[in-house]
């Protein structure tokens, strides 16, 4: 073996050793992070945990009344922990004040907590899940849920010429339950034929190819679920209102007074205005920058407020109490959209 080869092997071995040591350090830090999280749990939760098991976090999932609900055990879904558990079984238990009860098989689907018809009584319940691997390691998590009312119909506007080669994406917003069987789409109450020419479907997305004005309309997606016992007995729907508009003129005019006339000890404000001819709402975004180049948000002392109506966007810069340090400062107003960007400046001066 040559000296060059020995040196190469030495450095490769050293790198592998360092990488292994670094990986161990990361895993130890992850474990410590979840141990600290466990210590902050309220007593009503922590008393049910098995000290021999690692703690893998809590989850508060969204549910909709009258719809299916499912939840994964937190450590299985957590990006910091999921890589540790590949071959495992999950046990679910409902936590009550003075006892815990095993969840029946009808409420478990593919290892997840599954509730076919979520009602308000479930929103107050806590569930403990225990993941046990093939070699006997275990990790636990706690799941709660809260109710969110789904929107009746979500509007979406698409401008022709924007991303025509990719088509229009419509997402079926079923977020509260996994393991659905299939999704069917309707336009204006007529079922859509997924022919992979005009329409294609990927997971929860409907893709409308070669967009045109006639694609405007009401789109409903119907999600079909298999319950544990009965096939295709649950259907949930969501709605989108699509408006396709012609290609727009995205040019705009930015208007700003070059001076802010102020009085020491008093409030002051100035408005930067963008006037657009586009039909799109919020086509122009306006931002204020301070003299150091930092964006100004809704902070104390100096802050900005954005409003938009009928093709006019305004960003007002407010000074709560003008002091001498503001005199002579120059602030930049930046208006931009996907196509254009314009900037104007204004300087604080004493009246």
Swiss-Prot record:
GO biological process terms, semicolon-separated: symbiont-mediated suppression of host innate immune response; symbiont-mediated suppression of host type I interferon-mediated signaling pathway
Glycosylation sites: 117, 182, 261, 269, 321
Example of a GO cellular component annotation carried by this entry: extracellular region
InterPro entries found in the cross-reference section: Ig-like_dom, Ig-like_dom_sf, Ig-like_fold, Ig_sub, IL-1_rcpt_fam, Immunoglobulin_dom
Top-level division of the source organism's lineage: Viruses
Domain Ig-like C2-type: 65-137, 155-237
Function: Counteracts the antiviral effects of host IFN-alpha/beta and key IFN-inducible proteins involved in viral RNA degradation suxh as host OAS1. Acts as a soluble IFN-alpha receptor and thus inhibits the interaction between host IFN-alpha and its receptor.
The protein's name in its UniProt record: Soluble interferon alpha/beta receptor OPG204
Lineage: Viruses, Varidnaviria, Bamfordvirae, Nucleocytoviricota, Pokkesviricetes
């Amino acid at each position: 073996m040559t000296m060059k080869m020995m040196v190469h092997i030495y450095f490769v071995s050293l790198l592998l050793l360092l990488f292994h040591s670094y990986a161990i350090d990361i895993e130890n830090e992850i474990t410590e992070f979840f141990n600290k999280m466990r210590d902050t749990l309220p007593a009503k939760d922590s008393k049910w945990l098995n000290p021999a098991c690692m703690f893998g976090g809590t989850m508060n999932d969204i549910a909709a009344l009258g719809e299916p609900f499912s939840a994964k055990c937190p450590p299985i879904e957590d990006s910091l922990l999921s890589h540790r558990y590949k071959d495992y079984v999950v046990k679910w238990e409902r936590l009550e004040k003075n006892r815990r009860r095993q969840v029946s098989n009808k409420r478990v689907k593919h290892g997840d907590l599954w509730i076919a018809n979520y009602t308000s009584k479930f929103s107050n319940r806590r569930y403990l899940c225990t993941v046990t691997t093939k070699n006997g390691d275990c990790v636990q998590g706690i799941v709660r849920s809260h109710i969110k009312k789904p929107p009746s119909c979500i509007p979406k506007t698409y401008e022709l010429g924007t991303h025509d080669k990719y088509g229009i994406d419509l997402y079926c917003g079923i977020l509260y339950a996994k393991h659905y069987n299939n999704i069917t789409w309707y336009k204006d109450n007529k079922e859509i034929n997924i022919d992979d020419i005009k329409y294609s479907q990927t997971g929860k997305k409907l893709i409308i190819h070669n967009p045109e004005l006639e694609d405007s309309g009401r789109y409903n997606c119907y999600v079909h679920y298999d319950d544990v016992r009965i096939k295709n007995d649950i259907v949930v729907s969501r709605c989108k209102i699509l408006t396709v508009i012609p290609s727009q003129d995205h040019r705009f005019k930015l208007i700003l007074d070059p001076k802010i006339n102020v009085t020491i000890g008093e409030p002051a404000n100035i408005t930067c205005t963008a006037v657009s001819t586009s039909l799109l709402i919020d086509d122009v975004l306006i931002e204020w920058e301070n003299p150091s180049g930092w964006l100004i948000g809704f902070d104390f002392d100096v802050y900005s407020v954005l409003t938009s109506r009928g093709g006019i966007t305004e960003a007002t810069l407010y000074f709560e109490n003008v002091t001498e340090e503001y005199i002579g400062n120059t602030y930049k107003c930046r208006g931009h959209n996907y196509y254009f960007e314009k900037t104007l400046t204004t300087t604080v001066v004493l009246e």
